[in-house]
C-alpha cells in the first residue's frame, strides 16, 4: 500500500513537472517499474538526447545523469541520489588522461561512457559496451587509447586488428565474477546458455555464449531457443529479464555481482527528487562544449 501511494504521487508529480524518468537496467525493481524508460547506457543516452520533456529524472549513477546534462543542456536533469557514483569512473581524472595522452601523442582517445564529464572532454569519441568495437573500427588510426576500462578494452582488442592501449581501470562489480562461478553453474544447468558483460575479465568472457551489453542481453533472452540463461552481470538485470520472460529460467552468475551505487536510488528518494526538484546535475559549459562532441560522435557511429 505504501509503495502504491508513493508510486501514485510520483506519477502525478511527473505530469506536473513535465518530467520523464529514465532508469538503468541495474536499478531496483521498484525504480524500473516507476520509470518511463529502462535501458542500457547507449539506449539511455539516445533517449536523453531526443526526449520531449522539460525535466529528466535519471535513476542510475552520476556519470549517466552527467551525460544527459551534456546532451540536453536546455533540460533540467535531476539525480534522486547524488551520492551514487561509479568506482570505475573515479579511476581516471582529466589530469591523468592528459598525462596518458602526452605519453602517446597524436593517438585518438576512445572513452567509455562510464567516465566523468571532465574525462569525456579530453576524449575524441565515447563508446558504450554495446558499440565499443564499432566505435574503435570507425577511427582511422591503427592504434587507439582506451579509457578507463581495461577489460572492455581487452574485449575490443579481441575483435579488432587495431592496437588497443588501455588504462588499467575496471568495474569492481564485474571483476568479482570468476570463471569458476560459470563452471560450477554449468554443472547444475548443463543446457543453459551463458551471457556475460564485456566489463568482465577475459577468462570469464571466454566461457560465454554471448558477451553482451545489458540491452543486448534483453534481446538475447527473448530468443525462442533460449530457455535457461546464466547471467553474468550486476544482479539488478535479472528483474527485467524475468519480468519480460516469465516462463524462462534466469540464474545470476554470482550473488556477489552487486553494484551498491545502483541500489542507492529508492522510491522515496525518487519522490523527493520530483517534489523538491533536486538534485540538479549540471556540467560547466566549458567542459560540456568539449564533452558533447565526443558523445555526439559516438551517437553518429551507431
Swiss-Prot record:
Q: What's noted on cofactor binding?
A: Binds 1 [4Fe-4S] cluster per subunit.
Q: What gene is behind this protein?
A: nadA
Q: Tell me, which GO biological process terms does this entry list?
A: 'de novo' NAD biosynthetic process from L-aspartate
| Residues the entry annotates as binding iminosuccinate | 24, 41, 112-114, 129, 197-199, 214
**Predominant location category:** cytoplasm
Which EC number(s) does UniProt give? 2.5.1.72
- Role description: Catalyzes the condensation of iminoaspartate with dihydroxyacetone phosphate to form quinolinate.
The broad enzyme category this protein falls into is transferase
Q: Which organism is it from?
A: Dehalococcoides mccartyi (strain ATCC BAA-2266 / KCTC 15142 / 195) (Dehalococcoides ethenogenes (strain 195))
Q: Name one GO molecular function term.
A: metal ion binding
Q: Which reaction does it catalyse?
A: iminosuccinate + dihydroxyacetone phosphate = quinolinate + phosphate + 2 H2O + H(+)
Q: Which UniProt keywords apply?
A: 4Fe-4S, Cytoplasm, Iron, Iron-sulfur, Metal-binding, Pyridine nucleotide biosynthesis, Transferase
Can you tell me which residues bind [4Fe-4S] cluster? 86, 171, 259
Q: Which cofactor does it need?
A: [4Fe-4S] cluster
What family is it from? Belongs to the quinolinate synthase family. Type 2 subfamily.
- Supply the HAMAP family for this chain: NadA_type2
Pathway(s) where this gene product acts: Cofactor biosynthesis; NAD(+) biosynthesis; quinolinate from iminoaspartate: step 1/1
**Pfam families in the cross-refs:** NadA (PF02445)
Q: Which GO terms describe its cellular component?
A: cytoplasm
Compartment(s) of residence: Cytoplasm
Q: What is this protein called?
A: Quinolinate synthase
Disulfide-bond pairs as recorded: none
